[in-house]
């Protein structure tokens, strides 16, 4: 269960392949997500299949100047990326009460970025969710992978797989609805 929460800032419910580190700093801190997992592919995948349930409501927080205005429809998101990265890609969100260095660094989108700096994105699949589903019925999704490169495969030992499921698509900007949730099963 991925659930958004808000005390002073928005903590987007997020499930992803990679690591997370939080560093406290007075009345706030920095959360750093390191995207990417080493994974060996025998064959090239064509899609990511998941079951999901979601509650997606209008935006009530926009702490770090994200793209969604308050009272507009929030978005949840599930995406997969097949990558050829030498290191994980880091996204850092910093918020300290009365701080002057608040912001988001490293945000990326596989739909619009072919290389965020660590190596190329070979292909991606993305599902944007803007509506609440039934709380009791699981929705089936088959997220097709779109290929930027039809032949390259990740180098042995490189980071090759990114999966991200977020109750708030722009949670790295602390931008979204604090009441959203996204339940994921059968990935």
Label every model-predicted segment.
Residues 1-44:
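Surface-exposed, low-complexity/disordered Ser/Thr/Gly/Pro/Asn-rich loops and linkers
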Residues 48-52, 56, 145, 157-172, ...:
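Extracellular beta-strand-rich recognition modules
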Residues 61-64, 92-93:
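Short, solvent-exposed loop/turn and secondary-structure capping segments
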Residues 87-156:
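Extracellular carbohydrate recognition and processing domains
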Residues 2, 38-57, 64-70, 83-85:
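Solvent-exposed strand-to-loop "edge" motifs in beta-rich extracellular domains
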Residues 135-137, 153-156, 168-187:
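Extracellular carbohydrate recognition
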Residues 67-72, 176-178:
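Short consensus segments that form the blades of beta-propeller domains
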Residues 77-80:
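Mobile, glycine-rich extracellular loop/lid and propeptide segments
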């Amino acid at each position: 269960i991925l659930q958004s929460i808000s005390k002073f800032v928005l903590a987007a419910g997020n499930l992803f392949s990679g690591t997370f580190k939080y560093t406290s700093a007075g009345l706030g801190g920095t959360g750093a997500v390191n995207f990417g997992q080493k994974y060996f592919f025998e064959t090239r995948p064509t899609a990511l299949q998941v079951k999901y349930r979601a509650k997606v409501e209008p935006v009530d927080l926009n702490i770090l100047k994200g793209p969604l205005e308050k009272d507009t429809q929030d978005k949840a998101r599930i995406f997969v990326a097949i990558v050829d990265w030498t290191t994980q890609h880091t996204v850092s969100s910093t918020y300290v009460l009365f701080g002057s260095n608040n912001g988001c660094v490293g945000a990326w989108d596989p739909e619009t970025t072919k290389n965020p700096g660590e190596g190329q994105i070979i292909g991606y699949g993305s599902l944007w969710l803007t509506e609440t589903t039934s709380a009791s019925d699981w929705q089936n999704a088959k997220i097709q992978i779109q290929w930027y490169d039809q032949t390259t495969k990740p180098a042995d030992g490189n980071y090759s797989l990114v999966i991200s499921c977020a109750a708030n698509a722009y949670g790295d900007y602390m931008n979204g609805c604090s009441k959203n949730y996204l339940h994921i099963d059968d990935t």
